[in-house]
């Protein structure tokens, strides 16, 4: 990559050195990936998108979309179980802390165009789509535009089922502005359930690198409208944690049930916003059962 290209692709990092530091951390986490994987790139109109592919080729294909400020390696706590039963594609979302090229999109349409290109590039007629937090917002936004490439939709702790609490926004803003170890650890504790296990030291080290090396995170999406909820596909699984920090999970649960009774909604005890880590085994089992339920599209 030329210096010009490096500067172009480093736009959402604090510096070229920060980008290099983050990619080194990415490689260290990937070295712990517990299953065989293929690292590949697919072409999009915004630059190449990086994808980690794991799991048997004959299994139901599923694309994973990570949370804001993360990358494909943040699924490391789930990949062993998922890749045992599914063909998993974990993509680095554009404009975030991974290997995907291109600047952070400025609009919902641009994000959806990018995701459309990724789905085309993977080359499967249809895939299951699973998003966590910001990735759940992106998955739902894409399905509002088209469902022709998606067989099933799983949403883990969507950030916009209700308006975000002011206290959460304030804590997140402080941690982004002053990403000291104390601040980032406090924020991590807030988004996790008090019953969740402590992240291993290497995972916290990677989290600190990601917070310190980026120019902020993707902008929080606005609250899902009643119409947005009503048009969620019939084959949708939505999982929330009882200790959700962004909003009242009971209120969100009731809202989805009232407006989208066709959606399967689960409320997990012992899980916060970081639901895929806090209750990894339960989330993994639910995802495998959901995406394998009626067979798959080859």
What annotation goes with each model-predicted range?
Residues 50-98:
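Conserved HGGG/HGGXW glycine-rich cap/lid loop of the alpha/beta-hydrolase fold
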Residues 164-169, 177-236:
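Conserved alpha/beta-hydrolase catalytic His-Asp/Glu region
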Residues 90-130, 285:
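Active-site loop/oxyanion-hole signature of alpha/beta-hydrolase fold enzymes
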Residues 1-60, 86, 125, 292-298:
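Alpha/beta-hydrolase fold catalytic core
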Residues 137-144, 151-179:
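Flexible "cap/lid" loop of the alpha/beta hydrolase fold
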Residues 68, 127, 131-136:
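Conserved alpha/beta-hydrolase "nucleophile elbow" surrounding the catalytic nucleophile
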Residues 237-271, 277:
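Conserved loop-alpha-helix segment in the C-terminal half of the alpha/beta-hydrolase fold
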Residues 263-298:
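Catalytic active-site module of serine/aspartate enzymes centered on a nucleophile-bearing elbow/loop
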């Amino acid at each position: 990559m030329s210096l010009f290209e490096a500067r172009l692709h480093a736009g959402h990092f604090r510096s070229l050195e920060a980008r290099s530091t983050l990619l080194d951390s990415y490689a260290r986490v990937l070295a712990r990936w517990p299953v065989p994987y293929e690292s590949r790139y697919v072409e999009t109109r915004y630059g190449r998108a990086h994808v980690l592919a794991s799991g048997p080729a004959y299994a139901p294909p599923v694309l994973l979309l990570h949370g804001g400020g993360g990358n494909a390696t943040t699924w490391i706590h789930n990949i062993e179980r998922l890749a045992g039963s599914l063909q998993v594609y974990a993509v680095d979302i554009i404009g975030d802390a991974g290997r995907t090229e291109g600047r952070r999109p400025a609009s919902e349409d641009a994000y959806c165009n990018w995701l459309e290109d990724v789905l085309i590039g993977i080359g499967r007629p249809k895939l299951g789509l699973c998003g966590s937090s910001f990735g759940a917002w992106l998955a739902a936004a894409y399905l509002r535009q088209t469902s022709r490439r998606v067989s099933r939709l799983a949403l883990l702790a969507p950030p916009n089922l209700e308006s975000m609490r002011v206290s959460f926004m304030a804590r997140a803003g402080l941690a982004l502005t002053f990403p000291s170890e104390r601040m980032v650890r406090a924020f991590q504790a807030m988004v996790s359930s008090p019953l969740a296990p402590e992240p291993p030291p290497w995972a916290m080290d990677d989290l600190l690198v990601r917070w310190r090396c980026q120019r902020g995170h993707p902008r929080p999406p606005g609250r899902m409208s009643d119409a947005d909820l009503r048009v969620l596909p019939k084959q949708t699984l939505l999982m929330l944690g009882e200790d959700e920090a962004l909003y009242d999970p009971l209120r969100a649960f009731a809202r989805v049930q009232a407006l989208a009774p066709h959606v399967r909604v689960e409320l997990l005890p012992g899980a916060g916003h970081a639901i895929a880590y806090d209750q990894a085994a339960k989330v993994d089992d639910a995802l495998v059962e959901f995406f394998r339920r009626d067979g798959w599209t080859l």
